[in-house]
Amino acid sequence: MDINEEAYAIQEEVVEFRRALHRCPEIAFHETMTMEYIREHLEEWEISYKIFDPSGIIAVVGNGKKETIALRADMDALEVQEETGLDFASLNHGCMHACGHDGHTAILLATAKILKKHESELDRRVYLVFQPAEETAEGARFMLKTGVLDSVKRIYGVHIFNGIPSGKISLEACLLYTSDAADE
């Protein structure tokens, strides 16, 4: 089975990850339930991780000799009242995952699970960064100040976007989907 087949095989699990996260959105630097959800899965899959206070998790898979890379997902929600009526709608009044961070976190969790399964095949260390407070630049600054990412040569992020057909990706060498950091 190749990686694509493995990803499709756990698609329903990823949907459940997203829906569970969507039900319990949390604002910047208060992502405690989200972090607990992530931590439980990392422990279940025997993936090592470090928790940063007040919020943020970096998990590690692989130990190869090539340069270390990082994969990043954002965890925070917006202070918006959800009125979708979905059976997995937000249970936190006045707080909602309105721009896909629940999906981003679910995707990174699935990636962690698959990478762990193939850990012996990896030629490098991969950091899985679950970043708080993405809606401002503060979350990125906080994660960088930990020093854990100092050895990372490249960081890859993901952002759900309706303008790209399903099954396709867009790679851009510029700032995208940023609100505060565009002028830095």
Task: Label the model's feature ranges.
Residues D2-H97, A106-L109, K113-L122:
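Acidic/His- and Gly-rich active-site-bordering loop/insert found
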Residues D180-E184:
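A short, hydrophobic C-terminal helix/tail in secreted or cell-surface proteins
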Residues L78-V80, L86-M96, G103, S120-S179:
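Histidine/acidic-residue-rich, glycine-tolerant segments that coordinate divalent metal ions
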